[in-house]
């Protein structure tokens, strides 16, 4: 049976610019907003868009991500005619190797894609924060009779050189693609979201492999090849909230923006929910000595200090006299008595000892996964 569209989420990135936060886990597995992981947004978009089959392509430190996704039940993707498949690099008889680029990861999973037999493939990044109706993008792809549709976001001209830029005609057909141009002609930036007619993409990738032609990356190789070959390539304009959280600063900013009840992600919209795998936790405890304002406090937290404009993730502890401002405290982290935390991201399971002061005023301060700060070595 032919399926209309298969989603493939590229989730193998190391995320080196996130420093300590990705030393032990892949970037898409990093926590966000108190109860989510970054990949939840792409998975939830798929579920809300009516996409029933999703392949998650992993590579770097995949264990936490694999455990989080499980069988896809948290996103309603565990039905008879639906499912989530974790796709990791493997060695085949031809000596296949680690994924060498975004489109090379697709090539290495041709057998899986063929088993789903889709008419279209939707390529997604697993490390962006946004809500998007992929079904609307697919309808645009069909209406234009396109071979490839690229989701684009209008960015300020001064930032355009950071992105792949699409130059389009009056009908939004892409006539030129420039990868991070010094002098951009347009402000339509690629979001790294693509819809391809599967057979056309498949034929191109197979032919390139046989001819030893480099087609390992969508931005550097595939899109330019499509344009040079005269394929119909169109832009799909996206006007909603979208955040690339590839740096510590941008991840911190996105979390701070999320605190607002009227945040641009519209997190309380019941018609487009963001789903996640959430383990059952005990109720919060907020002591009579505590003071909490303008903050998100998730299940299982213990608060006996002061929390201002911050996020406390599942099971975080803030002990007596501690003060937390403009910070993200991830799951299971413990902030000791009289500690002072300002403008920081404290990783999962981290321990901040009593009286420690952390000030990220000049640059967002990061404490890594299970890191201990101020704990004597004999107690480490």
Swiss-Prot record:
Enzyme class: transferase
InterPro entries recorded: ADP-Glc_PPase (IPR011831), ADP_Glu_pyroP_CS (IPR005836), GlgC_bac (IPR023049), GlmU/GlgC-like_hexapep (IPR056818), NTP_transferase_dom (IPR005835), Nucleotide-diphossugar_trans (IPR029044), Trimer_LpxA-like_sf (IPR011004)
Pfam families according to UniProt: Hexapep_GlmU, NTP_transferase
Alphabetically ordered keywords of this record: ATP-binding, Carbohydrate metabolism, Glycogen biosynthesis, Glycogen metabolism, Nucleotide-binding, Nucleotidyltransferase, Transferase
TM stretches of this protein: none
One record GO biological process: glycogen biosynthetic process
Pathway linked to the protein: Glycan biosynthesis; glycogen biosynthesis
EC number: 2.7.7.27
Binding annotation for alpha-D-glucose 1-phosphate: 164, 179-180, 190
Catalysed reactions listed for this entry: alpha-D-glucose 1-phosphate + ATP + H(+) = ADP-alpha-D-glucose + diphosphate
Record-level Gene Ontology MF annotations: ATP binding; glucose-1-phosphate adenylyltransferase activity
General function of this protein: Involved in the biosynthesis of ADP-glucose, a building block required for the elongation reactions to produce glycogen. Catalyzes the reaction between ATP and alpha-D-glucose 1-phosphate (G1P) to produce pyrophosphate and ADP-Glc.
Family: Belongs to the bacterial/plant glucose-1-phosphate adenylyltransferase family.
HAMAP family linked to this entry: GlgC
Complex and partners: Homotetramer.
Name this polypeptide is given: Glucose-1-phosphate adenylyltransferase
Organism: Streptococcus sanguinis (strain SK36)
């Amino acid at each position: 049976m032919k399926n209309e569209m298969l989603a493939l989420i590229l989730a193998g990135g190391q995320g080196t610019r996130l420093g300590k936060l990705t030393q032990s886990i892949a970037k898409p597995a990093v926590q966000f907003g108190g109860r989510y992981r970054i990949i939840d947004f792409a998975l939830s978009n798929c579920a809300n868009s009516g996409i029933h089959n999703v392949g998650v392509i992993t590579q770097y430190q995949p264990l936490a991500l694999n455990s989080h996704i499980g069988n896809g039940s948290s996103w309603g993707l565990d039905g008879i005619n639906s499912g989530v498949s974790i796709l990791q690099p493997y060695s085949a008889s031809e000596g296949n190797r680690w994924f060498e680029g975004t489109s090379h990861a697709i090539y290495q999973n041709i057998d899986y894609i063929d088993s789903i037999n889709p008419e279209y493939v939707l390529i997604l990044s697993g490390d962006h924060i946004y809500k998007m109706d992929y079904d609307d993008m697919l309808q645009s792809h069909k209406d234009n009779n396109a071979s490839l549709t690229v989701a684009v976001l209008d960015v300020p001209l001064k930032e355009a050189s950071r992105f792949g830029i699409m130059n389009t005609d009056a009908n939004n057909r892409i006539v030129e693609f420039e990868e991070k141009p010094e002098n951009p002609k347009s402000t339509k930036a690629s979001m790294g979201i693509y819809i391809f007619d599967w057979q056309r993409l498949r034929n191109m990738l197979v032919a390139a492999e046989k001819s030893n032609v480099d087609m390992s990356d969508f931005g550097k190789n595939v899109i330019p090849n499509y344009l040079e070959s005269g394929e119909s390539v169109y832009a799909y304009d996206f006007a909603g909230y979208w955040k690339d959280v590839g740096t510590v600063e941008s991840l911190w900013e996105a979390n701070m923006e999320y605190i607002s009840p009227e945040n641009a992600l519209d997190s309380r919209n019941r018609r487009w929910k963001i789903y996640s795998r959430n383990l059952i936790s005990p109720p919060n405890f907020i002591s009579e000595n505590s003071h909490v304002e303008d903050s998100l406090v998730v299940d299982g937290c213990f608060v006996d200090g002061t929390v201002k404009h911050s996020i406390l993730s599942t099971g975080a502890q803030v002990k007596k006299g501690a003060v937390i401002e403009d910070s993200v405290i991830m799951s299971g982290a413990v902030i000791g008595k009289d500690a002072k935390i300002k403008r920081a991201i404290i990783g999962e399971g981290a321990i901040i000892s009593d009286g420690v002061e952390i000030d990220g005023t000049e640059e967002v301060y990061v404490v890594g996964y299970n890191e201990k700060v101020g704990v004597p070595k004999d107690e480490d």
